[in-house]
Design a protein with these regions (language model features):
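Intrinsically disordered, low-complexity polar regions and short flexible loop motifs
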Residues: 19-255
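Sec-dependent bacterial lipoprotein signal peptides
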Residues: 1-19
Length: 255
């Protein structure tokens, strides 16, 4: 077995063989000594919403799924599940591949991204694949897994919209993360349990009365802040697109 092996005893059984499309979570793996813990988020907004698969160190780890789905786990306004799961890897450098597979096979048909990331032992990471074509990049974000205080939830914001200089994130009409550039990560912030409101993104410095690039949830629906969760808000898509798969959007990832 390769030295950069993936700990897939549960994943192969539960993640590939028995899962339906976009239901790709493996059983959670233990935080073993000398492992690193990872989730990968497909946030590359193509005009066509391809069915894709992920490989790590040339080993397929998912069945077919679509934009914007995390693996493993899920979130709000994403594919996937409602769980904050990660998978375990041997620490060090690992190769990540996102590709459109040949129909009915594990081989790659259209390569969307391949590149290396370096991950340390004993830590948790979310790896976001952002932008498209030759500009696709892996944005590696370390995770703080400390449980928040009772009656609070801890957030951070990751900006994955390439064609805006920087973004301000709002919740319930208030700026909670300011001037975050593409691939930037905000400082963590705390919101009180049961607070209700909508998320919105605007170009950095824009007045709060200007039209938002995106709002979540849509319409008059609010999100109510849960208790003692760890979540990442991330923006995706492209500014100026008004229809289809590439419109600006807000998603929340369970960490």
């Amino acid at each position: 077995m390769q030295s950069k092996h993936i700990l897939l005893s549960c994943l192969l059984a539960a993640g590939i063989m028995s899962c339906k499309k976009n239901e790709i979570d493996p059983l959670p793996l233990k935080d073993l000594d000398n492992t690193t813990n990872v989730k990968i988020v497909h946030a590359s907004a193509y005009l066509t919403n391809y069915s894709v698969h992920l490989k790590v160190n040339d080993q397929r780890i998912t069945n077919a799924f679509t934009y914007s789905t995390p693996f493993p786990g899920g979130g709000l306004n994403t594919g996937g599940s409602n769980f904050p799961w990660y998978f375990a890897l041997t620490p060090g450098q690992s190769k990540i591949t996102l590709a459109v597979p040949n129909v009915g096979r594990v081989t790659d048909s259209i390569m969307l991204y391949t590149g290396n990331v370096t991950l340390d032992a004993g830590k948790y990471y979310s790896v976001y694949l952002a932008d498209t074509l030759t500009k696709t990049q892996a944005v590696v974000v370390p995770e703080n897994k400390a449980i928040p205080a009772d009656k609070t939830t801890r957030f951070k914001f990751v900006n994955l919209i390439p064609n805006v200089a920087a973004i301000d994130l709002y919740f319930a009409g208030n700026v909670v993360a300011a001037n975050i550039p593409f691939k930037g990560v905000s400082p963590e912030f705390i919101l009180p349990y049961t607070t209700a409101g909508q998320w919105a993104i605007r170009p950095a410095g824009a007045a709060p009365t200007t039209t938002a690039l995106a709002i979540y949830p849509s319409g008059t629906t609010n999100q109510t802040i849960p208790n003692q969760r760890i979540m990442t808000v991330y923006s995706r898509g492209y500014n100026g697109i008004t229809t289809g798969n590439r419109v600006p959007a807000i998603s929340l990832l369970y960490n």
